[in-house]
Amino acid sequence: MNNPESTKTYKPKQALEPTPQLYDELVGNCMEELAKSTIAEILPFPPGSVIFDVGCGTGAGTSAIVASVEDTSAILIKAVDINESAITVYKEKAAANNWPAEATKEDAQALSIPDSFLSHAIGTAFLFVLPNDGVEAMKEIYRTLKPGGTAAFNSWAYVPNMQPIQAAAKQTRPAGTPLPRGGMDKWENPELLQRVILEGGFQAEKVTMSQRDVYVTTTSVDRYAQMLWSFIGGTSAAGWLESDERKWDEAIEIIKEELRNSDGYEELEGKRLQLKFRANIAIVKK
């Protein structure tokens, strides 16, 4: 689920396995709060809506959709993700929470959904992991959305956890080593999200852009730093280095210090953290 660029199998003994369960613990309520902030722009979902949760992950977007609807029997959610483990967890949550959802393992760039089938499409923090900035997936969403249908997408204008990871990498690895999630900062500019939408087939006059702050509650700073470095630290083209095991504690301390200096950082009761993110949100009509 962490989309590594390297095929190297080595990892430090301290590194936690990047499972869907670790992902859920790491992001806390981040993806659900991002989804809530995004779908707030397009509510309500009328009866008969067929809503597409693309890049659904373990179900944060669907959870936000369901929470916004009084009669869930009146809607249908179609969810896809390319990660089979994520789909397995999604299906477990769907069954446990009685979601009106169908989930399949699919590539968002080549969907099996018929043309003009969907009334709505929601894409939460998924474009940046796709080739060509997700343009091919955007074309598929355009194809499957009904004329007059509504789509909502987002990207991060500010994240408090990327600088700490990259600072740890710079300070504990040889000069010139590729940075984890290098190039992610290009998504801070909302113009990139808008460009991808337009290249996908949508018309500029039907796109509305905005920004929203998203406040996220997660675990203690110690646990969060361990999860963050485990999940993302080895995802660059260099993968994990053998020296990372020796310098693990140093990297964790750097991450913790950088997090404490981030905008909006707050330690809550019970040692939990509140972190502030800022999202670019795009609402578009077909």
Where does each model-flagged region fall?
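A short acidic, Gly/Pro-enriched loop at the edge of an enzyme's catalytic core
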Residues: Q109-A121
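Conserved class I S-adenosyl-L-methionine
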Residues: N2-F52, A60-S68, A86-V89, K93
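Conserved Class I S-adenosyl-L-methionine
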Residues: W187-L192, V196-E199, Q203-K286
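Class I SAM-dependent methyltransferase SAM/SAH-binding core
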Residues: V50-L111, E136
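A generic alpha-to-beta junction signature in SAM-dependent methyltransferases
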Residues: L43-F45, V69-E70, L130, L145, ...
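A short SAM/SAH-binding and catalytic strip from SAM-dependent methyltransferases
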Residues: S119-G134
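Conserved catalytic/acceptor-binding region of the Class I
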Residues: V135, Y142, K146-V221, R278
